[in-house]
Amino acid sequence: VGFFKTNPAAGHKGISAFIIDADAPGVTVGAHENKMGLRLSNTTDLIFENVRVKASAMVGPEGSGFKLAMNALNLSRAFVATLAVGIMQRALDESVKYAKERKQFNTPIIKLQMVQQMLADMAIKIEASRCLVNNTMKMMDAGIMVQKEGSICKTFVSDCAQEVTSNAVQIFGGYGYSKEYPVEKL
């Protein structure tokens, strides 16, 4: 889907969405970006030079492109937050498993108060994030526009994911940086 000005004088209300075949004459698809994360979603340059598009390829009514793009952005914010919750849960699961197995002075490190505090903080952030994601998704399912809620959700949950994964690396110690252990990639 591409978004183009069909009525430049109308500002954002003059943008329309079109389905355009990537093999159409005048369309060039650039190389995929090698990103740090979100590799499931491809990021590429799309170049349009003198591309002719039939009116039947328009998505929705003329001038609705900006609204469609913003709806997609709201959805993507909530989905990014959902992915972050999954990453956090994996970080916690791996951390608990490791803390039960790893011994310091013949005692599993899970018995250390600081490790327990880190694990508890991780669990709190995960639960709060899940609640925020669920609330945002319920609003979306009800057809409510979630510009504010989607932004809050993505920001809060992403920040929590950074803290949770950092704590996981701390619990793993030097092994947290090793590719042999799963928290390195989180």
Language model features with spans:
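Solvent-exposed alpha-helices and their adjacent loops that cap or buttress functional pockets
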Residues: P8-H12, M36-S41, G60, N71
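Short, charged, solvent-exposed linker or helix-capping segments at domain edges/interfaces
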Residues: G14, V29-A31, A55-E62
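Exposed loop/turn and edge beta-strand positions of beta-sandwich/beta-sheet ligand-binding modules
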Residues: G14, N42, S151
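Flexible, small-/acidic-enriched active-site or ligand-binding loops
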Residues: D23-K54
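Short, solvent-exposed coil/turn linker segments
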Residues: P8, D21-A22, V53-K54, P108, ...
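A short core secondary-structure module
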Residues: V1-V29
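Alpha-helical interface subdomain recognition
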Residues: D45-N50, P61-L186
